[in-house]
Amino acid sequence: METWFAERPVGDLRPGDHAWLAFASGEEQSRVIGDFVFDGLNTQEKVVYVTDSRPLELPGLLTRHRIDPTPFTEVGQLRLIPLEKACRTRGRFDPDRMLATLNQEIEVAFDQGYRAVRLTADMGWALREPGGSDLMLGCEQEFEAAVAPSTMTMAICQVDRSSCSPGELTALRNTHEVLVEVNPEFDDGILKITRTFAPHGLRLEGELDGARHAVFAETLSSVAVPKSKVHLDFTRLSFIDLGALNLLAIYAMRMPGGGGLVLDNLRPDVEQVIEMVGWHRLPGISRGQGERS
């Protein structure tokens, strides 16, 4: 069965969005959840986070946005609810208790006069319990029905993708209509550059021409990791000029040993440009995954 998703940067989430994040690293979690929480605090929205973490341990707030969230917890704008209180009964995940807790928090935020409420929880721990995946599926389906028609609620359900099997991740993802991702590194309406984390690299969308070489080179340098491959996802890239290919070749040659660039999901028209130049003239650059025709 084909499933439809809206893919949205975290900064574009809006009330009614019940979003899914299966993060591949702490950095990805910080960039999505940290921005989600920060944006809510910055716009005077209520933020509810189901977690046993202390305020200074929340992803991305101190390390990325350089703010201490403690004052926001003291005035009630940021509400941290421990797992035992929010969704555990006799030490086990209790979906009914989770749903009741979140619905109550939504009602309280509305009574307090907030124009919107943001909800999030890292549920990887629940998936590791016996039968946790099935319990999570039921909980997510009911929560989707509650959030989708809302005019003031948005939520991100987050898990570490290593906490469960690919099949479980797919089933849980399919209970959401929105897939949330990091905000773009660059977007001028012609070229959009977004960080990717599994695999590590960048996704390019639109057209990469001479006017955007500098920003592309700068962004590419920012994701370099010694002795690691950098993947460039070309699925949505409709045009790349010869100057950009030359830039890639120069960059690849300068990468430390063991590094290199991998071009994933090459479109036929983009591949034709590369074939015209010749792969042998692009040392350090290799074809990656994705079919080409």
Which sequence ranges carry the predicted segments?
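STAS-like cytosolic regulatory interaction modules
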Residues: 71-74, 149, 159-239, 243-293
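Positively charged, polar, low-complexity stretches
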Residues: 1-192, 272
